[in-house]
Amino acid sequence: MWRLKVADGGNDPYIYSMNNFIGRQIWEFDPNAGTPEERAEIERLRHHFTKNRHKGFPSADLLWRVQLLREKNFKQSIPAVKVGDGEEISYEMALDAMRRGAHFLAAIQASDGHWPSETSGPLFYVCPLLICMYIMGFMDKVFSPEHKKEMMRYIYNHQNEDGGWGLHVGGHSNMFCTTFNYISLRLLGEEPDVEAVCKARNWIHDHDGVTSILSWGKTWLSILNVFDWSASNPMPPEYWMLPTWVPIHPSNMMCYTRITYMPMSYLYGKRFQAPLTPLVLQLRDELHTQPYDQINWRKVRHMCATEDLYFPHPFVQDLLWDTLYLLSEPLMTRWPFNKLIRQKALNETMRHIHYEDENSRYITIGCVEKPLCMLACWVEDPNSEYVKKHLARIPDYLWMAEDGMKMQSFGSQSWDAALAMQALLSCNITREIGSVLNSGHDFIKNSQVRNNPPGDYKSMFRYMSKGSWTFSDCDHGWQVSDCTAENLKCCLLLSLLPPDIVGEKMEPERFYDAVNVILNMQSKNGGLPAWEPASSYYWMEWLNPVEFLEDLIIEHQHVECTSSALQAILLFRKQYPGHRRKEINNFINKAVQFLQDIQLPDGSWYGNWGICYTYGTWFALKALSMAGKTYENCEAVRKGANFLRKIQNPEGGFGESYLSCPYKRYIPLDGKRSNLVQTAWGMMGLICAGQADVDPTPIHRAAKLLINSQTEDGDFPQEEITGEFFKNCTLHFAAFREVFPVMALGEYCNKVPLPSKKK
């Protein structure tokens, strides 16, 4: 039986931590764990998911919840609430529903104070890790038979009925993910004549074979030796030797893109390929529709399957690749340039890889980069300590749920904890849940990054991190503006509560450090990006080589990051009015103006990390309301409220399709269904806009849906994925289904006047 362990570094000598592993979450298989009844319950949950898998829903992350609720012996003691047709919601009904949700949310807190949760959804994550383990010879050392069984369960559970796999859970089949999941099954030991494998292979052949896979697919298939490197556009490591004032220098790129192409350029520059094994030769035969040695690799370089293509390459980009391909690469791969320039570039690239690995405790910045950096270290020296340190951190990426084992984007520990704590604080029941708030407060304080990256970090193209919070845990090391802001908000709110209940407040200097990170992130237009200051030219997006994502070459300002930062700075100014007053006032004015400037004509805001217009509009309205903008005095607030009322469903809920993100226009869910997480966002947006003072009916209708949808134990059902990134891919935050409905009900009880049944 699989069990989750938290804040545990194990006995591996090659793993280390900045805060004693607080926030770490890893799954281990114990054949002796669990009673027969517990094992039967897990199998029932697995069977139920598989039976309903074609609904396109992600997992409800039930294995962890079952484990923790049993460990805590949680029993919901507050009776369920149902609002009848035509019945008015009383304060007592809303309070009971809110308390039921808050007590359930409190019960799924881990011993170190965070809320373990799945962060997944894309279906291209695990294949590169498996390719890496296969090439390095660690497949059976890292993954037990139970690992492999659960990975195959996950892959099969998310196979579409046509035999393919989508870019993400619930997405239409494409060549990229169908090929990746086909290869994953074969590497895990599945035979080619298995029915589901045959069905996937038929899908690939029916769509003209694997040669039309997008560029990341071409890269990994070249590494596996199922493609030839001449099928890939150039990724020269010489980029790292350019002067930083050159616009296309990697230092001017968004960090995820920079660190993805860093090891890619190393492997490309080395032209590394896996040895030809019987399995690799079989994959060549199975995936291609013509003999391998007859494929014109140069011809397929610009090919991309229709199903894969979201961001077509502009002509100027293809011209650049063709120039490098025809003129530069033939020189760099021949003497003397391969010794004088290429080798020097490879050494410089490797220096940056080692720096990034060390600074993230070998977690690396994310799951796309992890296998690439690990393989680059192995290619440099297969017996190095770098490789051993990488291997020790693989468990940090693996997550188990009722749909099987998957590779996460990386953990969302700090993000989820900040939101969960604010949800509980919104309920205003501090003494009921004091120990939970105390534990969460400790986790947040222990998760703050206390130092900048080591050495001359600016020369390594890094930004300050001292005082920040990451998206995941402290060891990850990468500052994020909204994660810093949301955790700072928690610490500021908790500092106003009795320390004997919620713990001692954070030292002022640590507040100042967090504020310093946020202030220095603001762009000239008043907005904030996610990871690093935005200073590059927008035209660089024309060079985006990633055909399935958009806006990932440079940092962009986001409504959510700006909103979170503005809220945090407003709270901070209230408690520390003398600190950097002029700078802070200027920051606030610019951020407010930015939010008003980017509002769309229909009154909405485009969200970049959640789906999409509902998410962005709630964030914008929350920040504007905290800045003193109201329905009466601000047209932007009125327009935002009008937009939310317009998209509200007849039963009171909100439901937005992920298709809003790529098409950049509001698209409702099929059948105008409602989604409870999005209902919470829409409801809170209306509350922030002051809708209760105009006409509270839309808020009451949304609250009724939340209350009546609550389960017997106080949880809420899992529905469609509600996260997204880079315009075209969804991201499953399993914690959202509890956090946001509880937060919405907390605000409803404490900000919206309700009649009382008490005489």
Swiss-Prot record:
The keyword DNA damage does not apply. The active site is at D482 (proton donor). The keyword Iron-sulfur does not apply. Transmembrane segments: none annotated. One of its GO terms (cellular component) is lipid droplet. Its EC number is 5.4.99.36. It catalyses: (S)-2,3-epoxysqualene = isomultiflorenol. It comes from the Eukaryota. GO terms for molecular function: beta-amyrin synthase activity. Keywords: Isomerase, Repeat. Oxidosqualene cyclase involved in the biosynthesis of bryonolic acid. Converts oxidosqualene to isomultiflorenol. In cultured cells, IMS1 mRNA expression is high between days 16 and 20 and precedes the accumulation of bryonolic acid. This is Isomultiflorenol synthase. It comes from Luffa aegyptiaca.
